[in-house]
A protein has these predicted regions:
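Outer-membrane beta-barrel signature, preferentially recognizing the C-terminal barrel domain
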Residues: 252-279, 304, 348, 396-411, ...
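Transmembrane beta-strands of outer-membrane beta-barrel pores
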Residues: 165-169, 195-199, 239-243, 290-294, ...
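Flexible loop and strand-edge segments within Gram-negative outer membrane beta-barrel domains
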Residues: 198-206, 210-216, 226, 230-284, ...
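Outer-membrane beta-barrel translocator/receptor signature
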Residues: 103, 118-120, 126, 131-204, ...
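Acidic, small-polar-rich N-terminal luminal/periplasmic segments of exported/outer-membrane proteins
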Residues: 23-156, 269, 431, 435-437
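Repeated loop/turn-to-beta-strand initiation elements of outer-membrane beta-barrel proteins
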Residues: 186-189, 229-235, 279-284, 321-325, ...
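Residue-level signature of outer-membrane beta-barrel architecture
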Residues: 181-182, 225-226, 276-278, 315-319, ...
Length: 461
């Protein structure tokens, strides 16, 4: 696929207007209580907003194009999947501002779509790692962090704005606009909107690739600030919509003459983050989130809805050469599926609660030891909601599983020189039975008996 940005226009508005502002003032640090901790080999890759801007990234494939451990497949946003060392995002723990991005609406589409313009930092951990990575991080974890108004304002600026227009030679346009400013000395507000219109692109031989045209719209609003000198709070809302005519399997190549089907994917996410920096013994971080996502379309015009909510509460204690992080997280997922027009036919519910502790100890200035443990409790239920021939529910009795798993990790990192580091580690990660693919719920739920079927020998991965 060839892709070239031929033209890009960016307009900014700020107050006060400072055209000759010195570089030193531009880089002036704003008030922040966020700590930066060196955690050894826990983070294999970190991408900053400056890196993303340098890449001129338009999607996640551009963001990770120079990351050998991470690849992104899929020619349209709805079909993009993230892979770490060949394992797709279903086996990763992906968070956006601490909100876990889980569950699968349809196994031929992705679960993570983000606008690069909103990203402040990305941390990637390849492979099973630390206890703080969250549940189910078999293939690793990716932590996305979004910008706020304070990140965009410089110096004494009180408000600002940006308008951006891009044209792609391979049949596409992108327009975005943002407004940001201070509500008070300690609070800021960021509003962002973008729209992308792509026609079918052409491959390297000039052949049109069918099923790659799509319209994407994104709205994002984030308020953030200090409720006290040592307490920070941010609240954000995001709404994303993507429409197009895709093949029966959007991430597959469309064969000549194959039909395309009108499809639409939607996602609404709400996140609240809180930080309390009391002392070296108490650095409290809390996240609460709720996500609703849906997909309608495909060959059979099916509709799948997933609702997710959860929280993560952790504290970090810094004692001499040792840093301890410990906490609890919880997530619950609910999926319903059925025809695009008609009653819901199948449903599943799943939850996981984790308790974790992770430590980093500087044995010597050159030697770092990391060690941790995580306990996860998994609960899963499935239910058939369809009626029989006479209008009587097939069954209202759910069937389920309840299991738990303990995971350990330990690692060493030795700084040989300024340019060379030697690392050694062992880590475990567990992934219990989760809610299924919304498209295939009806394929394995029922065997003709009175209750749904869950294999009794299913154990966490």
């Amino acid at each position: 696929m060839k892709k070239l940005v031929l033209a890009s226009a960016v307009c900014t508005l700020s107050s006060p207007v400072v055209f000759a502002q010195s570089l030193e003032n531009q880089n002036e640090e704003t008030k922040s209580i966020e700590r930066v901790a060196v955690v050894g080999a826990a983070t294999n890759l970190s991408i900053t907003a400056e890196d993303i801007e340098q890449f001129q990234a338009n999607d996640l494939a551009d963001v990770f194009r120079e990351s050998p451990s991470v690849s992104v497949g899929g020619s349209v946003g709805v079909a993009q999947k993230i892979f770490i060392r060949g394992l797709e995002d279903a086996y990763l723990n992906v968070t956006v501002d601490g909100a876990q991005q889980t569950s699968t609406l349809f196994h031929h589409i992705g679960r993570v779509t983000l606008d690069p313009d909103l990203l402040k930092q990305i941390d990637v951990q390849a492979g099973a790692g630390e206890a703080t990575s969250g549940p189910g991080a078999i293939g690793g974890s990716i932590r996305f962090k979004t910008k706020d108004a304070q990140d965009l304002l410089r110096g004494d600026e009180q408000f600002g704005g940006r308008v951006k227009a891009s044209y792609f030679s391979n049949e596409g346009t992108r327009y975005s606009g943002s407004l940001y400013g201070k509500l008070s000395d300690s609070w800021g507000l960021l509003g962002y909107y973008s729209t992308v219109d792509r026609d079918n692109f052409e491959d390297g031989d000039g052949n049109e690739v069918l099923g790659t045209a799509a319209d994407q719209d994104l709205m994002f609003l984030k308020a953030s600030g200090y409720i006290a000198d040592n307490q920070y709070l941010s609240i954000s809302a995001e709404q994303r919509d993507e429409e197009g005519e895709f093949s029966a399997r959007p991430n597959w190549v469309v064969l000549e003459g194959a039909p395309l089907y009108p499809s639409e994917a939607e996602r609404d996410t709400y996140v609240a983050n809180y930080r309390f920096d009391h002392s070296a013994l108490v650095f409290l971080e809390a996240t609460a989130y709720q996500t609703s996502s849906s997909f309608r379309g495909g060959r059979f015009d099916f509709l799948s809805d997933i609702d997710t909510y959860g929280f993560d509460i952790r504290n970090t204690t810094d004692i001499s050469n040792h840093v301890f992080t410990y906490g609890i997280d919880y997530r619950k997922d609910e999926v319903e599926s059925g025809p695009g027009v008609g009653p819901v036919q199948n449903a599943e519910k799943g939850s996981v609660m984790g308790i974790y502790a992770q430590a980093h100890s500087n044995i010597t200035p050159e030697l770092l030891l990391s060690y941790g443990v995580r306990y996860d409790d998994f609960d899963f239920q499935q239910q058939i909601l369809i009626d029989d021939y006479y209008g009587t529910p097939v069954t209202d009795e759910p069937s389920g599983l309840d299991d738990n798993e303990l995971s350990f990790n330990v690692g060493l990192e030795y700084q040989l020189t300024e340019a060379w580091t030697l690392g050694l580690g062992y880590a475990e990660a567990a992934r219990g039975k989760q809610i299924g693919d919304g498209f295939t719920l009806d394929e394995y739920l029922y065997d003709g008996e009175d209750v749904p079927v869950v294999a009794s020998d299913v154990v966490p991965e």
